[in-house]
Swiss-Prot record:
Protein name per UniProt: Co-chaperonin GroES
Keywords tagged on the record: Chaperone, Cytoplasm
Stretches that traverse the bilayer: none
Subcellular location: Cytoplasm
Record-stated family: Belongs to the GroES chaperonin family.
A Pfam family matched in the record: Cpn10
Function: Together with the chaperonin GroEL, plays an essential role in assisting protein folding. The GroEL-GroES system forms a nano-cage that allows encapsulation of the non-native substrate proteins and provides a physical environment optimized to promote and accelerate protein folding. GroES binds to the apical surface of the GroEL ring, thereby capping the opening of the GroEL channel.
Gene Ontology molecular function: ATP binding; metal ion binding; protein folding chaperone; protein-folding chaperone binding; unfolded protein binding
Organism: Lactococcus lactis subsp. cremoris (strain SK11)
């Protein structure tokens, strides 16, 4: 399993619908990049210059919305994950 460093999180991106609202099947080039994902792993946080640890606000299992073109995609054990900084997360879905 992946263990993110500092203030990074590992996400499993949720698959988006591959059809338009009119029922037309979209090619991968015309599809919007998904922005919703499940948090799989969370780093310990970032340490400030004064030595204070700032922990990420998300936890494993949270569903989050993230910035569209952020992060690094990684394949592991046949699955695709996204690693990004917690500052690239926009919201937690409740």
């Amino acid at each position: 399993m992946l263990k993110p460093l500092e203030n990074r999180v590992v996400l499993r991106v949720k698959e988006e619908e591959e059809k338009s609202m009119g029922g037309i099947v979209l090619t991968s080039a015309s599809q919007e990049k998904p922005q919703t994902a499940e948090v799989i792993a969370v780093g310990e946080g970032k340490t400030t210059n004064h030595g204070t640890l700032i922990s990420p606000l998300v936890k494993v299992g949270d569903t989050v919305i993230f910035e569209k073109f952020s992060g690094t995609t990684v394949k592991m054990d046949g699955e695709e994950f996204l690693i990004l900084k917690d500052s690239d997360l926009l919201a937690i879905v409740e």
